[in-house]
Amino acid sequence: MAYGSMRQMRSYADKVFERDARLSRMTDGRHDPTLPLSAVLSTWQWGLMRRTPSTEQIGDLLRDRRWRARLGLKPEQGGSPDRLAQVLDGLATVEWNEMMLEDFFLARRAGILTDEVLYGKRCAALDLNELFKSEKIHCPQCQVREKTVQDEKGEKRIVKEYYHQAVALSWMSGPIPFVIGWEVLAPGEGELTAALRLLERLLPRLRRSLDLVLGDALYCCRPFFKTVCGAGLEGLAISSGQTEMDDEIDLLMKTDPPRMVPGFNVAVWEMESEAWERDLKGKLRVIHCERRYEAPSWKHERKQLRVVTSVPVEILPAGQG
């Protein structure tokens, strides 16, 4: 799909998703606001698309004359980074999550998200994202860390930085990645805890739209596979190298020769493991791929790749090593 100007893209998105109308219907905790909620949310979404690193920089858009004209904002309606943060703090998270899921289903029906499947499956991936960072606290749920800054005189000092993190579940099949939903981490909370909460909330409604959920080495654990497989889907995670299954595949590599991939100088060992069968009510597969050819450094190709999955090994392309 090709797009022209951002104005055309915005017009198309409003036609398919009715964005402005739906954003304007979201609950606004303010009393008689002068700054429309739809303008705030459109600014926030545009900042996310541009991967703007902080709320201050996103909020600066509300002072940009051209951006305000695009939103139809008048000078007396105001708008600042601090005001943007205050409005976002008052959003109803349940409504926002529901709208994101509706957007995914609308994009699927409109043919924007196609079934150019990966591994023969319709895939979504889990990943940790940092939403905003700022030297000003926005809400009680902000996480905090320290950083070193340098002033105009070259003197260094330590300041507190406040930020939010969220685990996102994103559609990965086809040329357009799409965030289906996310879960914000509470202060002191780990990525896996938030991710499991996200999966438990979304997967029952995605059974007809997804086949496979992907994760990095953090997700190579019983709770991830139990949650995904329990929802009737398949899971795949990069091996952490610290499970009983790693010991089993290491022993297999010492005793059995690999299978060589036709047309590629890639060695593959694969096996079924019963290590977590009691908890998962099924076996997991372990696949270890090893590249036997030299690759240019600029390609950043892995020398080895080991994955753990509930998908039958014959479905996975052995050349991924």
Please report, for each region that a protein language model flagged, where it lies by residue.
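Basic, short loop/linker segments at the boundary and entry of helix-turn-helix/winged-helix-like folds
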Residues: 2-45
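Short, positively charged, Gly/Tyr-enriched micro-motifs
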Residues: 31-102, 221, 228
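Short, conserved catalytic/metal-binding motifs centered on acidic residues
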Residues: 43, 58, 80, 84, ...
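Active-site-proximal, Lys/Arg-enriched surface segment
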Residues: 85-174
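Electropositive, glycine- and tryptophan-enriched low-complexity nucleic-acid-binding patches
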Residues: 146-209
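Short, structured patches in soluble enzyme cores that scaffold and shape functional sites
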Residues: 171-173, 183-184, 217, 237-241, ...
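Domain-level cores of phosphate- or acyl-group-handling catalytic modules
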Residues: 188-247
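An anionic, glycine-rich sequence signature occurring as long contiguous blocks
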Residues: 234-321
